[in-house]
Amino acid sequence: MSALIEAARRALSLMDLTTLNDDDTDEKVAALCRKAKSPDGTVAAVCVFPRFVPIAKKTLREAGCPEVQVATVTNFPHGNDDVSIAVAETRAAIAYGADEVDVVFPYRALMAGNRDIGFELVKACKEACGGKLLKVIIESGELKDAALIREASEISIRAGADFIKTSTGKVPVNATLPAAETMLAVIKEQGGQCGFKAAGGVKSATEAAEYLALAARLLGEDWVSARHFRFGASSLLANLQIEIAGGVAKPSSGY
């Protein structure tokens, strides 16, 4: 097995298979969930809007892969700084049955100099999760500056984030290797317990392999597991499957 095929299989097992589109329906979400398990492997999670969590869990059970986690999003996509709304949305997500919540950090507030509201929001949402996994989307492509990316990462981890995540996938610049390196370096400095999720823009096995290699270099091969590392993507799945089959991945405009 080639190194790239091996990386593709590994990346597939670390995917949060995602649909977060305004035109999502029960049928579209169910179709996505039926792709979670294939002869090429099983993804780590699916990520859908809160109202689709029940249909996602039902479809995954029926597809014979109840172990696939169901993630959802809150304070999404704009990362507003109203803590009470973010907490209410997070509680509602858990009530829907979500296993994991991806909350957007109030990144614009941080850019304006407010370093407190992000900590407060993440801490409150972690408490609202009631033991479920909390991933914090720092929107690295909007923060742009490495110092701000570092600061948002540090605040999120101190406030209790289980993962820090690059992007919503709804802005012009999503996951990049430089942002990932900054975030992973902070995770290492903070003890390596927090996980990392690259979201948006990772579309090929070659690109996925670069993120896997970066994480392994900074935190070790054993760290790179679904407990600590995820890809948030949609079009990536088909391209990984093409790579595993020995074909050539085609360009895609998906998440």
From Swiss-Prot:
Top enzyme class: lyase
One GO molecular-function entry: deoxyribose-phosphate aldolase activity
Domain of life: Bacteria
CDD domains: DeoC
Main localization of the protein described in the UniProt heading: cytoplasm
Keywords noted in UniProt: Cytoplasm, Lyase, Schiff base
PANTHER family noted in UniProt: DEOXYRIBOSE-PHOSPHATE ALDOLASE
Biological role stated in the UniProt entry: Catalyzes a reversible aldol reaction between acetaldehyde and D-glyceraldehyde 3-phosphate to generate 2-deoxy-D-ribose 5-phosphate.
Designated name of the protein: Deoxyribose-phosphate aldolase
Species this protein is from: Chromobacterium violaceum (strain ATCC 12472 / DSM 30191 / JCM 1249 / CCUG 213 / NBRC 12614 / NCIMB 9131 / NCTC 9757 / MK)
Source lineage: Bacteria, Pseudomonadati, Pseudomonadota, Betaproteobacteria, Neisseriales
Gene: deoC
